[in-house]
Amino acid sequence: MKIIALDIGGTAVKSGLVDNGVLKEHRETPTPAAEGGQAVVALAKKLIAAYLPEGADGIGISTAGVVDSKSGSILFAEDCIRGYTGIQVKALLEDAFSLPTAVENDLNAAAVGEAAFGAGKGCKSLLCVGFGTSVGGAAVLDGRLYTG
């Protein structure tokens, strides 16, 4: 399974193509945060389109801000990306590319990744703390991402 993955942060957008769990390609591009949320989505579309010739089964987005992971919309992110709040990332990308898309908060995604593949592999619970453009944290308790 091939997944186009993007990590949208306040200063950089990291993108890559993951093929059966192996990162095959990787790019890093400055985030146009000062230009606003629509510019960030436009950059995401451009990066995704660049990977499409390789083939893809889906899109995975981790992003700064408070995210409604069910709808894939940004509930709040004004502190890091102006005008990002309210953007429905999942719907915009699914409409543009006709690929299933998942959107999650960046620290939640990092915690799940660490639990499955990284420092927390084999642990029942873990706390993941991130320091970057902003500060955040996420917890995996009894093997499940704790939200709410």
What are these regions (language model features)?
Residues G37-V41, I59, V66-S125:
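Glycine-rich phosphate-binding loop and adjoining helix at the ATP-binding site
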Residues G55-A56, G148:
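A short alpha-helix-loop-beta-strand transition element characteristic
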Residues K2-A42, I74-F76, L145:
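Short glycine-rich, Thr/Ser-proximal phosphate-binding strand/loop in the N-terminal lobe
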Residues K121-G148:
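Glycine-rich phosphate-binding loop of actin/hexokinase-like ATP-binding domains
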Residues A39-L52:
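Short, well-ordered amphipathic alpha-helical segments that serve as non-catalytic structural scaffolds
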Residues I3-D7, A56-G60, L126-G130, A138:
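Short glycine-aspartate micro-motif
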Residues T11, A64-V67, G132-S134:
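Short glycine-rich anion-binding loops that position phosphate/pyrophosphate groups of nucleotides
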Residues D19, T63, L141-D142:
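A cytosolic small-molecule/anion-sensing beta-strand core signal
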